[in-house]
Amino acid sequence: MKLNKIKVIVAGFRGKMGATAVQMILNAQNFELMALLGKKEEVSEAFGVPVFSRKEDLIGFDADIWLDLTAPEAAYKNTRFALENGFRPVVGTTGFTDDEVADLIKFSREKELGGLIAPNFALGAVLLMQFSKQAVKYFPDVEIIELHHDGKKDAPSGTAVKTAELMSEERLAHHQGAVDEKEALAGARGADLEGMRIHSVRLPGLVAHQEVIFGSKGEGLTLRHDSYDRSSFMTGIALGIRKVMTVSELKYGLEHFLDL
C-alpha cells in the first residue's frame, strides 16, 4: 500500500536549524521535501527539489506544510503568507508579538487550517516550561536565565518569554528583590515580566539552554534544560508537522500536542 506522505516546504534551509530539518525530512518515511526557500539564492535546485528566493513564487505550489525556520523580522509575514495560500505553517522562528500571534490564530480559524508556532521544539524544553508552571504555585519568587549561541538575534528567547507567561497564569504579579534596589548599571537586573526577571546570555559554543531558579525560605529549586545540538529539536518538528494535519487552527506552543 502506497504511503501518503506529508509534503513539506522548508523556508530558511540555509541556516543551521533549517539544514538539520532538511536532513530529517529527507530521512523520514512519511514526509516528502517539495521545495526550499532561501535568501538571494543563486541555485535553482538542491536535494532534488526546486529552490526559490521569493515566497511569492510558491503561490499555487503543491505542498501541505510550510516549515519556517527563518528570522524574526520575516516570520509573521511568512506565516500569514502560508495560511493565505493553503499551507499549514509549522514555525520555529521566535520574536512574535502577542498581537501577531492572536491575529494568526484568528486567521487560521477563518481558513480552517492547522498550524503551530513553537518557541521551542525540544521536548525537554516544553516539559521544563510545564514543570515551571507547576512549581511556581509553591515557589512564587523566580528568575529565568536563558543561554544561547551568539548568533541568536532576539532576546530574551521565545522559550524564556513563554515560560514566564505560563508561570504568570499561576502567580500573582509582584516585585522581587529589595523594594528600594537600584541598578548600578542599567539592565543589571534583566528584563521584567510581571516582576519575574529574565536574563539573557549570548556566547559562542552554546546552543540553547535555560534555567528557572526558584527561591524560598531556607531552600531553592532549579530546573534546567540543555540542547547540546540541533538534533534535539527534530523530534518536536516532526511531531508538529504530523499534528497540524489533524487540527483546524493554529496553536502557540508544542505542549498543545503533548499528553501533559
Curated annotation (Swiss-Prot):
PROSITE patterns: DAPB
Binding site for (S)-2,3,4,5-tetrahydrodipicolinate: H149, G158, T159
Binding site for NAD(+): G12, F13, R14, G15, K16, M17, G92, T93, T94, A118, P119, N120, F121
Subcellular locations according to the entry: Cytoplasm
A GO biological-process term: diaminopimelate biosynthetic process
MF GO annotations: 4-hydroxy-tetrahydrodipicolinate reductase; NAD binding; NADP binding; oxidoreductase activity, acting on CH or CH2 groups, NAD or NADP as acceptor
Annotated residues for binding of NADP(+): K40
Keyword Ribonucleoprotein included in the entry's annotation: no
GO CC field: cytosol
EC number: 1.17.1.8
Chief place where the protein resides: cytoplasm
Pathway: Amino-acid biosynthesis; L-lysine biosynthesis via DAP pathway; (S)-tetrahydrodipicolinate from L-aspartate: step 4/4
Catalytic residue list: H148 (proton donor/acceptor), K152 (proton donor)
InterPro entries: DapB_C, DapB_N, DapB_N_CS, DHDPR_bac, NAD(P)-bd_dom_sf
Reactions listed under catalytic activity: (S)-2,3,4,5-tetrahydrodipicolinate + NAD(+) + H2O = (2S,4S)-4-hydroxy-2,3,4,5-tetrahydrodipicolinate + NADH + H(+); (S)-2,3,4,5-tetrahydrodipicolinate + NADP(+) + H2O = (2S,4S)-4-hydroxy-2,3,4,5-tetrahydrodipicolinate + NADPH + H(+)
Enzyme class: oxidoreductase
Keywords per UniProt: Amino-acid biosynthesis, Cytoplasm, Diaminopimelate biosynthesis, Lysine biosynthesis, NAD, NADP, Oxidoreductase
Its job: Catalyzes the conversion of 4-hydroxy-tetrahydrodipicolinate (HTPA) to tetrahydrodipicolinate.
Record family assignment: Belongs to the DapB family.
Stored PANTHER family: 4-HYDROXY-TETRAHYDRODIPICOLINATE REDUCTASE 1, CHLOROPLASTIC-RELATED (PTHR20836:SF0), DIHYDRODIPICOLINATE REDUCTASE (PTHR20836)
Protein name: 4-hydroxy-tetrahydrodipicolinate reductase
